[in-house]
């Protein structure tokens, strides 16, 4: 912030030189953590006493199998789940880019949709869910499952990619 103010002051002629000109701060790039297949299985098998944690776990697993972003999952409607040749698919557009996408629904995501259909409001598949609540509860899910990694909801999308690559290489 201060560097920006000084740069603007120098550009506008308010100071003769920019004392920060030689300093460059490189971004702190952190390697993203991911879950192993065994950790995903452990999360799926864990029995939660708290129904909120069970919901958060199931939505995270849904994302692992569909690669939907949080906002795309949050806005997923029953109209976007269609049957094609006897199989269920999600046909929608990305919220962020408006680019169409399609995802075949495997058994586990279908079971999750069925489990939470009572939450459906205004055709939303999972009702109203809050991102920050989800993130906070996801930390509790990981802790209760004995996973000591800093996992975000976005991590589920990366699991889907590695899972897809693994399946396609078999």
Annotate each predicted stretch with a short phrase.
Residues 55-56, 128-132, 148-168:
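Short basic/aromatic active-site micro-motif
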Residues 2, 59, 71-76:
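Alpha-helix N-cap/helix-start motif at helix boundaries, enriched for small hydrophobics
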Residues 11-70:
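Basic, Lys/Arg- and aromatic-enriched nucleic-acid-binding interface segment
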Residues 5-8, 12, 79:
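Alpha-helix C-caps/helix-loop-beta hinges
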